Every structure is written in structure tokens, then in C-alpha cells.
Design a protein with these regions (language model features):
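Conserved acetyl-CoA-binding loop-helix of GNAT-fold acetyltransferases
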Residues: 107-121, 144-148
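Hydrophobic pocket-lining residues that define ligand/cofactor binding sites across diverse proteins
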Residues: 122-126
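A short, well-structured alpha-helix characteristic of acyl/acetyltransferase catalytic modules
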Residues: 1-6, 11-46
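Acetyl-CoA-dependent GNAT
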Residues: 45-105, 121
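Active-site acidic-Proline motif in GNAT/NAT acetyltransferases
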Residues: 102-104, 108, 137-138
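Conserved acetyl-CoA-binding loop of GNAT-fold acetyltransferases
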Residues: 147-157
Length: 176
């Protein structure tokens, strides 16, 4: 997927991509919104290796800006448990996650353009009815970005984060 100087390419099972992810997961501004802690190289490889496979249920794309990796974006079909958690009844619903790992490139539209590229793909090629993004409630820049992409706040919910702490999330949806 491509839009001018933004390219979304599949994450590769190689040292270069894993090392880039490790670099980004060392940034507090990144890991505090996703894993709640720094990840080691092996943890990153164990998490992302299955997502590099063609039949992955959670395809991950490296976001490249001017041919340089700057973040990742991924999607997955929402399962029944999460539909209940999010209070969504539609059948073909996908959840999107994104982060721009290069902090100097925050707030310049790359995230918005990347989300719009993936959204178009999911609506056009996967026949998505609804797209969902669920940022932490305190991640105001992400919420603003998603609103600029046409996502609207549906509700708030509490659930455990990746290390078991209860967190407040915002469920945002974009309909086709």
C-alpha cells in the first residue's frame, strides 16, 4: 500500500525489522501506550514472528516514510469476546493498532495517512463494515489523530493491559 512518500509493507522476519521494533519499544512514549514496559529482542521476535507469516491473523505492516521505517500498523478481525467488550454487533469488524516509533515524526500527519491507507484497504478488499481503534483514555494525541481519520468515540471500557493492570480505554469506530 502506498500514498506518495508513505508505504505500508509487510513486516519481515529479519534482524533489521526486529531491531527497529526493539529500538522503538525502548521509548517510554511508545511502550507506555502498548506493552507498559520495554521489550527485549527475543520478546519482540516471539511476538512478531507469527505476524510475518502470509496466513497471520494479525498482519503487521512497517510504515515507511521516504523509504525509512518509522512505525508499524496492524489489523485483526474482531472476535466475539471483543465485540461484546466494545458493544459492537456488526459481523465484519476489524481492529487497527498503530504507533509511529520515530518520535520526531509525531504530529505531522504520517499516522493519519497510514490509518487512512489501511482503512481503504480494509473497506475495499476485506469488505469491512466497521473499523475499531481502542487507545488508552489518556492518549489524547492518538484520540485526536483517530478523530481526524473519521473515527468517532463509541464508548469507554476498562480491561487489563498487557501486564495485568486495569486501564481505561476509548472505543472508537469508523463505518464504511
Amino acid at each position: 500500500m502506498k500514498d506518495k512518500n508513505i508505504t505500508l509493507r509487510r513486516l519481515l522476519d529479519n534482524d533489521a525489522d526486529y531491531k527497529m521494533l526493539k529500538k522503538w519499544y525502548q521509548e517510554k512514549e511508545i511502550y507506555s501506550h502498548f506493552e507498559q514496559r520495554k521489550l527485549t529482542y527475543n520478546e519482540i521476535k516471539n511476538k512478531y514472528l507469527p505476524r510475518t507469516l502470509d496466513n497471520s491473523l494479525i498482519p503487521v505492516f512497517m510504515i515507511e516514510h521516504n523509504n525509512q521505517p518509522i512505525g508499524i500498523i496492524q489489523y485483526q478481525l474482531i472476535n466475539e469476546d471483543n465485540k461484546k467488550l466494545y458493544n459492537i454487533n456488526n459481523d465484519n469488524c476489524y481492529e487497527i493498532d498503530i504507533f509511529i516509533g520515530e518520535l520526531k515524526l509525531h504530529n505531522n500527519g504520517i499516522g493519519r495517512r497510514s490509518i487512512n491507507l489501511l482503512s481503504k484497504y480494509l473497506f475495499d478488499k476485506k469488505n469491512a463494515d466497521i473499523l475499531v481503534m481502542c487507545p488508552l483514555k489518556n492518549n489524547i494525541p492518538a484520540i485526536r489523530c483517530y478523530e481526524h481519520c473519521g473515527f468517532k468515540i463509541l464508548n469507554e471500557f476498562k480491561t487489563k493491559d498487557t501486564i495485568g493492570n486495569m486501564q481505561d480505554f476509548i472505543c472508537m469506530i469508523r463505518e464504511n
